[in-house]
């Protein structure tokens, strides 16, 4: 049988339809910031749709999918959808979901930084779950002429359930492309000096505006990272070690000791053992032990979201106060702070080396 007799669509059905390639097309470079995701609206239906996608990821829930899907569809989604929607509604901003709003601000803030330093790059963002999806944004970048893409996860510490699954989604999208762009990935930046500096600046600026804890009197700074099941540590995931590394570097930058600063893990899901100590019980214990003031900062979250605004700002605060604590402070995440935007630019620039991203700058721009 000749290939001439086979319908064209049958030969290319594995791959997305693409326009003809032209040698004269723009050869552009893109930086794609990737975050976890968020529901499109604070409604039970939207939240259930988001949770179904998120909790169906085998890198997030590592149990047999046939068993898990029955539990997820019959128990978890019906129960958690409405309860989670109420929590999202409590933190929803006029512009939309906090995570999406702050991520968009990061993109818009880093664009002029690149331009001012002579970089001609496209900057955009995508979400691993929900919209805009990684596949859709990669397709948009291709249509804009991007032939090289830097994937920059907004997860400073590597984990299979965050960084790796974002890369999975990107590579799956690439697998459907006939004409693939060149791709680089940033695995982690848990110990990057610019990231640590941005964290320290965020804490210092908060204390400058709201007062520094009286560490000599027993006040505490708690560094709360997102938790993961403990078995992932036993299976070789480096997340726990990188969280501890970030915490140690941040404490050093702030001049604090392990007596003044605690490291905890939040957002436990299910009954399995997760990384410990858990954040809410630790804050309750601190309050019961007579700690007057506790400041909580989340170094692993680069943008404020449900887990920081609601879980830390309401649930963990209540645990501390009910335990006997008097003064609770939630230090905002990096969001679009100048130090963090500068760090993003620096991390991206290091990973763009060798790609044609620089343009000639006018003498007055250089001086």
Swiss-Prot record:
Keywords: Cytoplasm, Heme biosynthesis, Iron, Lyase, Metal-binding, Porphyrin biosynthesis. Disulfide bonds: none annotated. Fe cation binds at residues 226, 307. SUPFAM superfamilies: Chelatase (SSF53800). InterPro entries: Ferrochelatase, Ferrochelatase_AS, Ferrochelatase_C, Ferrochelatase_N. It catalyses: heme b + 2 H(+) = protoporphyrin IX + Fe(2+). Catalyzes the ferrous insertion into protoporphyrin IX. NCBIfam families: hemH. This is Ferrochelatase. The lineage of its organism: Bacteria, Pseudomonadati, Pseudomonadota, Betaproteobacteria, Burkholderiales. The gene is hemH.
């Amino acid at each position: 049988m000749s290939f001439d007799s086979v319908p064209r669509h049958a030969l290319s059905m594995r791959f997305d339809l693409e326009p003809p390639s032209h040698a004269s097309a723009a050869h552009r470079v893109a930086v794609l910031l990737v975050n976890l995701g968020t529901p499109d609206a604070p409604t039970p239906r939207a939240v259930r749709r988001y949770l179904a996608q998120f909790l169906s990821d085998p890198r997030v829930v590592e149990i047999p999918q046939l068993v898990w899907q029955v539990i997820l569809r019959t128990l978890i989604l019906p129960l958690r959808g409405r309860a989670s929607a109420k929590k999202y509604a409590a933190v929803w901003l006029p512009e939309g979901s906090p995570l999406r709003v702050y991520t968009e601000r990061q993109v818009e803030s880093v664009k002029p930084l690149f331009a001012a330093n002579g970089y001609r790059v496209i900057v955009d963002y995508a979400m691993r779950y929900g919209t805009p999806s990684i596949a859709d944004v990669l397709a948009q970048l291709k249509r804009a002429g991007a032939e090289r893409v830097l994937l920059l996860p907004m997860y400073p510490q590597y984990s299979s359930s965050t960084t790796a699954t974002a890369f999975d989604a990107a590579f799956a999208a690439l697998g459907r492309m006939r004409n693939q762009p060149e791709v680089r990935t940033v695995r982690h930046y848990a110990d990057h000096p610019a990231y640590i500096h941005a964290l320290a600046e965020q804490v210092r600026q908060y204390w400058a505006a709201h007062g520094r804890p009286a560490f000599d009197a027993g006040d505490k700074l708690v560094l709360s990272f997102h938790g993961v099941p403990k078995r992932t540590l036993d299976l070789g995931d480096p997340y726990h070690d990188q969280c501890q590394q970030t915490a140690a570097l941040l404490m050093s930058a702030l001049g604090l000791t392990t007596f003044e600063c605690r490291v905890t893990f939040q957002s436990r899901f299910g009954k399995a053992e997760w990384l410990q100590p858990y954040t809410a019980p630790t804050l309750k214990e601190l309050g019961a032990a007579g700690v007057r003031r506790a400041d909580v900062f989340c170094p692993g979250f680069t943008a404020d979201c449900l887990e920081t605004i609601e879980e830390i700002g309401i649930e963990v605060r209540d645990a501390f106060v009910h335990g006997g604590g008097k003064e609770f402070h939630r230090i905002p995440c990096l969001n679009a702070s100048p130090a963090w935007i500068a760090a993003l630019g620096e991390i991206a620039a290091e990973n763009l080396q060798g790609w044609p991203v620089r343009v000639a700058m006018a003498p007055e721009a250089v001086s």
